[in-house]
């Protein structure tokens, strides 16, 4: 869509910098002929202009307000390399099937950003434009981060390959569970849950997002009892085990204190919540790199701005930022569980975490090729309302580089926690064996599980309890280029 001549950039310097108010496109924030440079940061926004606001002018406003513009002409622009520093909206297209919405592509010169700082990147890209009155709504759908910029970040402290080597576990997804109930248990009872899950065959057990240091269980007690459980389970099974010790706290000083204690106890992994903020995430990532500890990221709070299709930030962008910031594990959705997630869209999140180069794929919501410049890969985590009866779907959708976390699907087992873990481990090993034998696990999966359940009572009980449980609701965040998929 080209700019109307009436709002094209004013080339005459006297008119362009005369005191007063100009349209953003007139100030140069729209350039339909611009060809992005390899070093540009590119952003794709979904915008819904107010009635009567031209889509091109709205796109130019987004470019302006996320770079150098203000509401009026300022002569101090002439003291800068304004033409270079000015972000440029260079393409606008209607969103398929969404009247009144437009995709707009914006290019930013690399010099606008501080190296290695997600806080600075987000302050520009999302810092101001989402409250801008000429827009009814605005959503950041995707970004292309140039190699020159990616190389300024350290990325995951461990990565998938090294994690598997440390754990000595290959060729299958990792298994986990979140301790339930998430709040209220004493330290000793909490540790017993951890032990039972690990003894039954899980690789990890996990603190939930809101278990920190409350009156019913001080964080130090939790760490001590959990690591006692980990060590006991390791000794009895001969496998490396772990528990995601949540070190989220009110200050960085306290987070470091908890991380140091976790390391002293021999933990291979610590956990933080997304809500601690970008600077805290990058800081604790650096600590994990220096101390050879895995960093598990719980995406607590993301749904407040990622779920609605018209306004906010797509989770694929959050996943890109977190890979730069440096996390080893990231909750990325299940598609078949209780939480929001269209299957193809969720696969796009996984691609962002695990690929060396993420290719454009509109059906999965990916609008740009992204070269990760050798950054280590993030292990995606599927968690939330999944059970053993869905094992074939999960492996078919996500492959083997994933942590499958069955919280209620382990701890809610009718024969106890250890039986729940056994059911999940047997279902996993059975499905991986079937896959390796060349069977069609997507279609034969239920039959394969039923056959395995004949000789595994815990799996049979799990299938009897949850085999018919599904969460088939229409997703709110889906690709605009395909209908909502179903995995039922």
Curated annotation (Swiss-Prot):
Record note on cofactor: Binds 1 Mg(2+) ion per subunit.
Marked site positions, Transition state stabilizer: 338
Broad enzyme group: lyase
Residues binding Mg(2+): 206, 208-209
GO BP terms, alphabetized: reductive pentose-phosphate cycle
PTM sites of type N6-carboxylysine: 206
Reactions listed under catalytic activity: 2 (2R)-3-phosphoglycerate + 2 H(+) = D-ribulose 1,5-bisphosphate + CO2 + H2O; D-ribulose 1,5-bisphosphate + O2 = 2-phosphoglycolate + (2R)-3-phosphoglycerate + 2 H(+)
Residue numbers annotated as active site: 180, 298
Documented EC number(s): 4.1.1.39
Function: RuBisCO catalyzes two reactions: the carboxylation of D-ribulose 1,5-bisphosphate, the primary event in carbon dioxide fixation, as well as the oxidative fragmentation of the pentose substrate. Both reactions occur simultaneously and in competition at the same active site.
Note: The basic functional RuBisCO is composed of a large chain homodimer in a 'head-to-tail' conformation. In form I RuBisCO this homodimer is arranged in a barrel-like tetramer with the small subunits forming a tetrameric 'cap' on each end of the 'barrel'.
Family, as annotated: Belongs to the RuBisCO large chain family. Type I subfamily.
Name of protein: Ribulose bisphosphate carboxylase large chain
Organism expressing this protein natively: Xanthobacter autotrophicus (strain ATCC BAA-1158 / Py2)
Phylogenetic classification of the source organism: Bacteria, Pseudomonadati, Pseudomonadota, Alphaproteobacteria, Hyphomicrobiales
Gene: cbbL
């Amino acid at each position: 869509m080209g700019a109307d001549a009436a709002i094209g950039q004013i080339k005459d310097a006297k008119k362009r910098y005369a005191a007063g108010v100009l349209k953003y496109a007139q100030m140069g924030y729209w350039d339909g002929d611009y060809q992005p440079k390899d070093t540009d940061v590119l952003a794709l926004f979904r915008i819904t202009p107010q009635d009567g606001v031209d889509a091109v002018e709205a796109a130019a406003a987004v470019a302006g307000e996320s770079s150098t513009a203000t509401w009026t002409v300022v002569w101090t622009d002439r003291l800068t390399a304004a033409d270079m520093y000015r972000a440029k909206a260079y393409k606008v297209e209607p969103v398929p099937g969404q009247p009144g919405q437009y995709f707009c592509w914006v290019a930013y010169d690399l010099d606008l950003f501080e190296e290695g700082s997600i806080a600075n990147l987000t302050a520009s890209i999302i810092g101001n434009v989402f409250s801008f009155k000429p827009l009814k709504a605005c959503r950041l759908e995707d970004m292309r981060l140039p190699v020159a910029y990616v190389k300024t970040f350290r990325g995951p402290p461990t990565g998938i390959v090294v994690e598997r080597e440390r754990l000595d576990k290959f060729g299958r997804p990792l298994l986990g569970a979140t301790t339930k109930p998430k709040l209220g248990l004493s330290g000793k009872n909490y540790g017993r849950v951890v032990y039972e899950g690990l003894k039954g065959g899980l690789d990890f057990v996990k603190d939930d997002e809101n278990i920190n240091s409350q009156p019913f269980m001080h964080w130090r007690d939790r760490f001590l009892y959990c690591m006692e459980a980990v060590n006991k389970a390791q000794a009895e099974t001969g496998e490396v085990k772990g528990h995601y010790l949540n070190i989220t706290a009110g200050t960085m000083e306290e987070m470091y204190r908890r991380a140091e204690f976790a390391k002293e106890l021999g933990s291979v992994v610590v956990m933080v919540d997304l809500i601690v903020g970008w600077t805290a995430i990058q800081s604790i990532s650096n600590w994990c790199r220096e101390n050879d500890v895995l960093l598990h990221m719980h995406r607590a709070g993301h749904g407040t701005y990622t779920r609605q299709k018209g306004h906010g930030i797509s989770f694929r962008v959050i996943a890109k930022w977190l890979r730069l910031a440096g996390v080893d594990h990231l909750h990325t959705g299940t598609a078949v569980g209780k939480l929001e997630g269209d299957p193809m869209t969720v696969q796009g999140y996984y691609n962002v975490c695990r690929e060396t180069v993420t290719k454009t794929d509109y059906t999965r919501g990916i609008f740009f090729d992204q070269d990760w410049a050798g950054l280590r890969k993030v292990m995606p985590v599927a968690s939330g309302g999944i059970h053993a009866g869905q094992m074939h779907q999960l492996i078919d959708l996500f492959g083997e580089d994933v942590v499958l976390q069955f919280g209620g699907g382990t701890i809610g087992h009718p024969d106890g926690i250890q039986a729940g873990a056994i059911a999940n481990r047997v279902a996993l090993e059975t499905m991986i064996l079937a896959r390796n034998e060349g069977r069609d696990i997507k279609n034969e999966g239920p039959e394969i599980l039923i056959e395995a359940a004949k000789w595994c009572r815990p799996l049979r009980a799990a299938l009897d309890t949850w085999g018919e449980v599904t969460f088939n609701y229409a997703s709110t965040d889906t690709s605009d280029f395909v209908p909502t998929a179903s995995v039922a």
